[in-house]
């Protein structure tokens, strides 16, 4: 008979217990009560967090936005056509985040940071939360470096600094996107990473922007985040935050970034749609009560970081569309109060052929003047004053026919100044070219020319100065000041070119 030894049995049991490895996973699940219009109502999910990602049985991801006593309101990040009533949903324990890396440069992606340009996957080792807190007061420093847009009207009178938020506002078809894309083109060689976020636009418009950036070599330093008009409202609402997360990644790595949100009116409409479907109480213009917070938490992420954090910056150019020039509507007033100034584009000026159609009278930059270079300040003050006086005189001149000589001269000067502010699309000017152009206008060199000759003369003058007076550009770029020496080079160049030009015109 086999003897059973108790110590052997206990050793075997002990070994088995030590080797026993059963992992227990607790999954927070729920059941779909109702689904439709990009919204799902879920029963269960007791411990879900606000903003947490949830996963449906067939793979769709959603965000839990409404936590109510008996159900959870989830917005879907997809069409949700395969989700069935009664199917299960599980909480993931994560909140929305995207992968980030240098590899995103030159690519077109969607709000979930997936490439949509057909050029394969993007490799990334790091990730960032889509919604992350803005830098605090101690983490920032005041704006002091200029961000040149390449547009004379903006860089001289409504200057933008790195780390500023400047709103571009105007009716549809007034050139808002053109101002933004020209600014991206002007960052070539300036070591600025650009992020262009297209929200709720036609796919053809986005393709046009991407093509124009590619043709001019600007996609090398640009990321395009696009959620077109046929995208679910949830993704249109998320797209700006995705763009901000990508720009922040570069900002915290001591680089300068420029982000364009085109446009925030469409994001607000997508958010309104989501909120109404979630049965949140509507407020003014049927927008939910927290629509201000929607934009403020986005735009506050733009900053100029302190020297301890590496002095990186994120400059935001949000775009807002108005209806027949009504700046006092809900979304425009909200965004105006959040930003550090606005560039107002007028349909009347646009139709009158003044492009970019910037209404200098009501456009302001609240912090940009600190970022202007000294040379620009020296010439821009006079331009601003003369244009303001011209606008006033022009209104009076409509009523009186007999004007004295001084008034006639002032009107003629104003018309020529307005002419020199006109620029073709995708033709940004360097700051030296802008200074030279403004100086020519404010010092009366254009007064003897016909209005139709002004632009031709200025184009020839820029070429002439570049080839024959390169010292002018060298002095401005090295000292950032219009020194007496630079001024004398400039005067000589203008005089010589003016004589040549008038001689050509006579022939």
From Swiss-Prot:
PROSITE patterns for this protein: ATPASE_ALPHA_BETA
Gene3D superfamilies named among the record's database cross-references: 2.40.30.20, ATP synthase alpha/beta chain, C-terminal domain, P-loop containing nucleotide triphosphate hydrolases
GO CC terms of this entry: chloroplast thylakoid membrane; proton-transporting ATP synthase complex
Enzyme Commission numbers on file: 7.1.2.2
Subcellular location: Plastid, Chloroplast thylakoid membrane
Keyword Transmembrane assigned: no
PTM annotation (Phosphothreonine): residues: 257
Parts of the chain that traverse the membrane: none
Keywords: ATP synthesis, ATP-binding, CF(1), Chloroplast, Hydrogen ion transport, Ion transport, Membrane, Nucleotide-binding, Phosphoprotein, Plastid, Thylakoid, Translocase, Transport
Presence of the UniProt keyword Phosphoprotein in the record: yes
Annotated residues for binding of ATP: 170-177
Site (Required for activity): 363
Protein family membership: Belongs to the ATPase alpha/beta chains family.
Entry-linked NCBIfam families: atpA, PRK13343.1
Protein purpose: Produces ATP from ADP in the presence of a proton gradient across the membrane. The alpha chain is a regulatory subunit.
Protein name: ATP synthase subunit alpha, chloroplastic
């Amino acid at each position: 008979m086999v003897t059973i030894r108790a110590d052997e049995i206990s050793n075997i049991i002990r070994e088995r217990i030590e080797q026993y490895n059963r992992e227990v996973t607790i999954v927070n699940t729920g059941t779909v009560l109702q689904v439709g219009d990009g919204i799902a109502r879920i029963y269960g999910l007791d411990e879900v967090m606000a903003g947490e990602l949830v996963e449906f049985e067939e793979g769709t991801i959603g965000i839990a936005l409404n936590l109510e006593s008996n159900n959870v309101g989830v917005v879907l990040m997809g069409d949700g056509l395969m989700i069935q009533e009664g199917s299960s949903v599980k909480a993931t324990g994560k909140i929305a985040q995207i992968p980030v890396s240098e590899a995103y440069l030159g690519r077109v992606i969607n709000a979930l940071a997936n490439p949509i340009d057909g050029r394969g996957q993007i490799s990334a080792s790091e990730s960032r939360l889509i919604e992350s807190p803005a830098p605090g007061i101690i983490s920032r420093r005041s704006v002091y470096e200029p961000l040149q847009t390449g547009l004379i009207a903006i860089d001289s009178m409504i200057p933008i600094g790195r780390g500023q938020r400047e709103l571009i506002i105007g009716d549809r078809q007034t050139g808002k996107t053109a101002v933004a894309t020209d600014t991206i083109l002007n960052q070539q060689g300036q070591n600025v990473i650009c992020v262009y976020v297209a929200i709720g636009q036609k796919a053809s418009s986005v393709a046009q922007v991407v093509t124009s950036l590619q043709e001019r070599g600007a996609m090398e330093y640009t990321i395009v985040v696009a959620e077109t008009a046929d995208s679910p409202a949830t993704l249109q609402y998320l797209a700006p935050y995705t763009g901000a997360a990508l720009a922040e990644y570069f900002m915290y790595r001591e680089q300068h970034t420029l982000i364009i949100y085109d446009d925030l009116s469409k994001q607000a409409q997508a958010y309104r749609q989501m909120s109404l479907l979630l049965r949140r109480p509507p407020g003014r213009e049927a927008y939910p009560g927290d629509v201000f917070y929607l934009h403020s938490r986005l735009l506050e992420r733009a900053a100029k970081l302190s020297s301890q954090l590496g002095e990186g910056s994120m400059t935001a150019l949000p775009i807002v569309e108005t209806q027949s020039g009504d700046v006092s509507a809900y979304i425009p007033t909200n965004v105006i109060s959040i930003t550090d100034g606005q560039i107002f584009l007028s349909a009347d000026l646009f139709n009158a052929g003044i492009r970019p159609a910037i209404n200098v009278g009501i456009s302001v930059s609240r912090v940009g003047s600190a970022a202007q270079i000294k040379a620009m300040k020296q010439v821009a003050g006079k331009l601003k004053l003369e244009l303001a006086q011209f606008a006033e005189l022009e209104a009076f001149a409509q009523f009186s026919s007999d004007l004295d000589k001084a008034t006639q001269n002032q009107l003629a000067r104003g018309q020529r100044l307005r002419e020199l502010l006109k620029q073709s699309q995708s033709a940004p000017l360097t700051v030296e070219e802008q200074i030279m152009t403004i100086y020519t206008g404010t010092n009366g060199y254009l007064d003897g020319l016909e209005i139709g000759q002004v632009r031709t003369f200025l184009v020839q003058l820029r070429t002439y100065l570049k080839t024959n007076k390169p010292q002018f550009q060298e002095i401005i770029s090295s000292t950032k000041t219009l020194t007496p020496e630079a001024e004398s080079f400039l005067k000589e160049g203008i005089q010589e070119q003016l004589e040549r030009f008038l001689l050509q015109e006579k022939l």
